């Protein structure tokens, strides 16, 4: 069970009938708890989201014996701003994100007819880029085609900056000193691993994500992650798998950073030739 404010999620991997019973019992216990404390339980807002292609999709019930109803099944659920779909490909979320960011981008361009980079780029960084990057550690396991849609919002915006219309995308980024979205995604992923490895987060909530192995400095940094084989290519794109090779290859001086800002600066310094690049082979 996970609780955030008034939002509660009960989840379980279903591999047997016993797992189904345990999940149903958890739902029943939660309902009984609300009744005991005289809390109103909104059955209409309670949904079941079945994850995975081979999910048996059992029915689950909510309520007491007198008013016990089958819980509705949803195919798309918004959780803390991220749209979750049954296949976890985040196609719907990425499309919605691109639509929202493009709308904001077009609003900026419509209201600022003088297309000076010193005006447009700060606006893009503060109003558009946060939309494109929100929750990307979660949803960046999408296909390269989907992720290109995110990059294209920045690509199209920079084409409107005065004086650099005819430059290639990467040259425009370098001229504007604006990192590619792909590069920032990679750095963002590495920053999350850094926070976990250096325990910036509560260790109890993150200790199960990675298995760090002790190594001597002659074989790279001392926070390398054990990589377990997976026979499903889809899983390799999830955060806990996709970051391993890149993280394990980081030089010791980058991983040795003591603060978040120091890590960012050292990472940028080490990869200064890639900051404005695309097609960095991270997602392949």
Question: Which stretches of residues belong to each language-model region?
Answer:
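Short, conserved catalytic/metal-binding micro-motifs enriched in Asp/Glu and His
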Residues: 4-6, 34, 77-87, 101, ...
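Conserved, non-catalytic sequence blocks in retroelement Pol enzymes and Pol-derived host proteins
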Residues: 15-23, 88-96, 111-122, 140-150, ...
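Basic, alpha-helical interaction scaffolds
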Residues: 70-137
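Low-complexity, glycine/alanine/valine/leucine- and proline-rich hydrophobic stretches
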Residues: 212-246
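Catalytic palm subdomain of template-directed nucleic-acid polymerases
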Residues: 8-32
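Short, charged alpha-helical motifs in flexible N/C-terminal segments and linkers
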Residues: 31-49, 78, 146-215
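Extended, well-ordered alpha-helical segments in internal regulatory regions
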Residues: 127-142, 191, 195-201
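Short, conserved micro-motifs composed of acidic
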Residues: 25, 39-76
């Amino acid at each position: 069970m996970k609780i955030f404010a008034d939002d509660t999620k009960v989840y379980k991997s279903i591999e047997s009938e016993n797992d189904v019973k345990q999940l149903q019992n958890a739902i029943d216990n939660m309902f009984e708890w609300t009744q005991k404390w005289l809390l109103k339980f909104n059955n209409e807002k309670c949904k079941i989201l079945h994850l995975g292609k081979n999910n048996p999709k059992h029915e689950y019930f909510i309520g007491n014996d007198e008013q016990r109803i089958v819980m509705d099944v949803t195919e798309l659920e918004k959780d803390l701003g991220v749209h979750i779909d049954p296949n976890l490909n985040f196609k719907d979320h990425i499309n919605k994100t691109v639509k929202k960011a493009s709308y904001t981008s077009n609003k900026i361009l419509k209201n600022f007819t003088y297309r000076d980079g010193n005006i447009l780029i700060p606006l893009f960084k503060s109003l558009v880029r946060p939309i494109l990057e929100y929750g990307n550690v979660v949803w960046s396991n999408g296909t390269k085609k989907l992720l290109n849609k995110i990059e294209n919002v920045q690509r199209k915006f920079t084409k409107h900056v005065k004086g650099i219309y005819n430059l290639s995308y990467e040259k425009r980024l370098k001229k504007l000193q604006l990192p590619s979205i792909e590069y920032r995604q990679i750095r963002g992923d590495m920053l999350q691993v850094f926070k976990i490895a250096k325990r910036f987060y509560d260790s109890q909530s993150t200790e199960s994500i990675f298995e760090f192995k002790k190594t001597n400095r002659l074989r790279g940094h001392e926070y390398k992650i054990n990589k377990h084989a997976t026979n499903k290519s889809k899983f390799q794109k999830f955060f806990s798998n996709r970051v391993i090779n890149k993280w394990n290859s980081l030089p010791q001086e980058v991983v040795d950073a003591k603060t978040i800002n120091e890590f960012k600066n050292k990472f940028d310094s080490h990869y200064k030739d890639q900051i404005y690049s695309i097609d960095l082979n991270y997602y392949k």
